[in-house]
Design a protein with these regions (language model features):
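Peripheral/terminal regions associated with large enzymatic or DNA-binding modules
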Residues: 1-9, 14-304
């Protein structure tokens, strides 16, 4: 990066929008001055990669929001942003998983720059700028990362020229590395005056020092009350006090058996949207058949 003021990184299976450069230019001009910003994403996530949960960030009028998530499907850095990461990396080539870092990110190969960048972002409480509309997309072609072609991470590209509205960080919507909402100007969910940790994607394994947890995961802690999953994005079901039994509000200091009925059917319906159960059954059987076939072929190969 020493020879360049900024860098746009694109892998060979990435397609960019015709307005990606305009977005990149204005994002750099807007966010370079803020030390908490250490990257700019061209890609717009629509699912949480760890478990495929649907992701829709709350919109507040800005063309950008902030998230503690880096990715390799269209990423921008300025010299200042990259050098800050590189300096951290030189002294953290071995590092313990930060509380804010997802298990699946920490488990990536140690040759992955993304593993270290995620460690940097989550340990130093930094953020990346993300667009509400995508300026790059992943064609998900067969290669090192994908054994079969797919469309899971393909997104619709934004087209046309426009003047972007990009809010300062303190006015943006915030999400963490688990794609969970953080307190900001538009959102704050507390219980008895204490912040509630969000786990609506059911991906956390460590709850840190928090006493209260809102999760769609059925856990053996005392359930204070439950909420429904009716509105989008999912976190506003809490602030709007939506009735239902899909989200559990836990007191983590009280361990006890959760005897409430399973919420898996309702949570699945919420995340798959209009897909019919017949189609889901077909896909499930097809994937199971392919996996069994792969396992059999591996065993036969070993015998030879």
């Amino acid at each position: 990066m020493e020879d360049y003021d900024y860098l746009v990184m694109l892998e060979d299976d990435i397609i960019v929008s015709d307005s990606y450069f305009l977005y990149t230019k204005q994002a750099i001009e807007t966010y370079e001055q803020y030390p908490e910003i250490v990257g700019i994403s061209l890609y717009r996530f629509h699912v949480y990669p760890q478990n495929g949960r649907f992701f829709e960030p709350e919109y507040n009028g800005s063309d950008t929001y902030l998230m503690q998530v880096a990715q390799s499907w269209g990423q921008v850095w300025t010299k200042r942003m990259w050098n800050e990461f590189h300096e951290w990396y030189l002294s953290h080539q071995e590092f313990e998983k930060p509380f804010r870092m997802a298990d699946y990110s920490y488990s990536w190969d140690q040759r992955s720059w993304l593993r270290y960048f995620t460690g940097f972002v989550t340990s130093e409480n930094k953020y990346l700028v993300h667009p509400y509309h995508a300026y790059s997309t992943n064609t998900q072609e067969i290669g090192e990362n994908y054994k079969a072609a797919g469309t899971d991470f393909q997104v619709c590209l934004a087209k046309g020229q426009k003047e972007f509205r990009m809010y300062a960080p303190e006015h943006c919507v915030h999400y963490d590395a688990f794609f969970e909402r953080e307190p900001d100007e538009q959102f704050c969910f507390e219980y008895q005056g204490e912040r509630v940790l969000m786990d609506l994607n059911a991906a956390r394994s460590n709850y840190g020092y928090y006493r209260y947890l809102a999760s769609t995961n059925k856990l053996n802690f005392h359930v204070i009350r439950t909420y429904g999953l009716r509105l989008r994005p999912q976190e506003i079901n809490l602030t709007n006090d939506i009735p239902g039994k899909e989200i559990y509000l836990y007191d983590l200091t009280a361990v006890e058996k959760n005897s409430l009925p399973s919420n898996k059917e309702q949570v699945t319906r919420y995340n798959v949207r209009a897909t019919s159960w017949a189609r889901l059954s077909y896909l499930g059987m097809k994937e199971l058949t392919e996996k069994v076939g792969t396992d059999i072929r591996k065993k036969l190969k070993k015998k030879k």
